[in-house]
């Protein structure tokens, strides 16, 4: 079991990154809890893998300190691959921000906690979702926030089952303009 927290106010880093790696990070199991904050910076990150992040199993929970102006739970400038496990990511701005994404399995929750967040899940350049259950939630019910954004989104063998509309999907942005159903869920087709 691993618990990771950014340092206290006296010695906190400027960027406020709880777990950072330049190279590839692979998580195959275990219980990992990351609580992130930044004392001297308006933005903080929970798990920041510059090159590549691969999750094959385990129970991963990433949660910000609610005093932040901006907080991104999971971010990678390269490839994000999720094959299994349970991954719960909370952010005040973006919950998940990745350049290339492939989700083939597991149970993934991305949730924005701040009403003023303009996005929940940014799978920026290309995203392919082929399995698992992927829930994207705007906890504060902001009707203007983009729940899922991708310039190239592929859903193969999975369905969007809640909270999205065809117009926004066509624009590669999945929105939900309403307060009754502030989330979308993508899961494997039966």
Residue ranges and their predicted role:
Residues 1-190:
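A composition-driven surface/loop motif
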């Amino acid at each position: 079991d691993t618990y990771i927290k950014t340092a206290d106010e006296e010695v906190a880093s400027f960027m406020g990154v709880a777990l950072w790696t330049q190279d590839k990070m692979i998580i195959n199991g275990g219980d990992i809890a990351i609580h992130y904050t930044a004392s001297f910076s308006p933005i903080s990150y929970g798990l920041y893998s510059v090159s590549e992040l691969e999750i094959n199993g385990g129970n991963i929970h990433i949660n910000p300190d609610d005093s932040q102006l901006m907080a991104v739970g999971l971010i990678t400038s390269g490839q994000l691959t999720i094959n299994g496990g349970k991954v719960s990511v909370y952010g005040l701005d973006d919950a998940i921000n990745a350049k290339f994404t492939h989700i083939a399995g597991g149970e993934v929750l991305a949730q924005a906690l701040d009403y003023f967040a303009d996005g929940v899940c940014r799978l920026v350049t290309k995203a392919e979702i082929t399995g698992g259950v992927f829930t994207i939630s705007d906890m504060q019910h902001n009707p203007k926030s983009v729940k899922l954004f991708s310039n190239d989104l592929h859903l193969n063998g999975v369905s969007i089952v809640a909270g999205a509309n065809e117009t926004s999907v066509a624009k590669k942005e999945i929105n939900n303009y309403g307060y009754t159903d502030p989330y979308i869920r993508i899961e494997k087709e039966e």
